[in-house]
From Swiss-Prot:
Lipid-acceptor residues (S-geranylgeranyl cysteine): 198
Residues recorded as bearing Cysteine methyl ester in the entry: 198
Alphabetized PROSITE patterns for the sequence: RAB
GO cellular component, one term: plasma membrane
Localization (cell): Cell membrane
Gene3D superfamilies: P-loop containing nucleotide triphosphate hydrolases
Keyword Hydrolase listed: no
Name of the featured protein: Ras-related protein RabA
Family in the record: Belongs to the small GTPase superfamily. Rab family.
UniProt record, GO biological process: hypotonic response; intracellular protein transport
Length: 201
């Protein structure tokens, strides 16, 4: 039986705990949002198919824990990854400062040609914003990484961010071909994960 999609891409979310990775994932895959979403402990993933120029593209999107104590368990999740979304909270300066550390981790564990995107989430919280988007853009430009501000709560730039990444992956599909065997056999078995209650916008 032939596959029903043109390409399969594996995306991963990384970033500090509480920045809204799970909320972005829920907004994109299910178009839902909740103020009291339970945070991820360990790893979890969702599957979504998008259509680019009439072609079906299947996405396997991994949501990882932001806590330092779980990071060692997450390193293996970079295997076969095509793109990584590094998320920070625009109302939390420390989460933005830690973006550099997350990028260092990506460069250490992910494939050399992995595509990266920096996302400043919770852009709807204008009065509480502390991270200057111009500085964030400047930082991203210095690393030749795409930058976008999003709001999972108001569904701002969520789909645009994912579609942009998909198009970048398609444009660079030839670079991924040496790893196509491993990436095309990604195990879709849902990993064991636990949840703890917290508020994430």
């Amino acid at each position: 039986m032939s596959k029903k999609y043109e390409h399969l891409f594996k995306f991963i979310f990384v970033g500090d705990s509480g920045v809204g990775k799970s909320s972005i994932l829920l907004r994109f895959t299910e178009d839902t949002f909740t103020e009291s979403y339970i945070s991820t402990i360990g790893v979890d993933f969702k599957i979504k198919t998008v259509y680019i120029e009439g072609k079906a593209i299947k996405l396997q999107i991994w949501d990882t824990a932001g806590q330092e104590r779980f990071r060692v368990h997450n390193n293996s999740q970079y295997r076969g990854c095509h793109a990584v979304m590094v998320v920070y909270d625009v109302t939390d300066q420390r989460s933005f400062e830690n973006v550099a550390k997350w990028i260092q981790e990506i460069e250490r564990y992910a494939r050399d040609n992995v595509i990266k995107m920096i996302i400043g989430n919770k852009s709807d919280m204008i009065s509480q914003k502390v991270v200057d988007p111009f500085l964030a853009q400047e930082f991203a430009d210095s690393l030749d990484i795409t930058f976008k501000e999003t709001s999972a709560k108001q569904a701002i730039n969520i789909e645009d961010a994912f579609i942009s990444l998909v198009k970048l992956c398609i444009d660079r599909i030839e670079e991924f071909k040496p790893s196509s065997t491993s990436s095309s056999t990604i195990i879709l078995k849902k990993p064991q994960s636990q949840k703890s209650n917290c508020i994430i916008n």
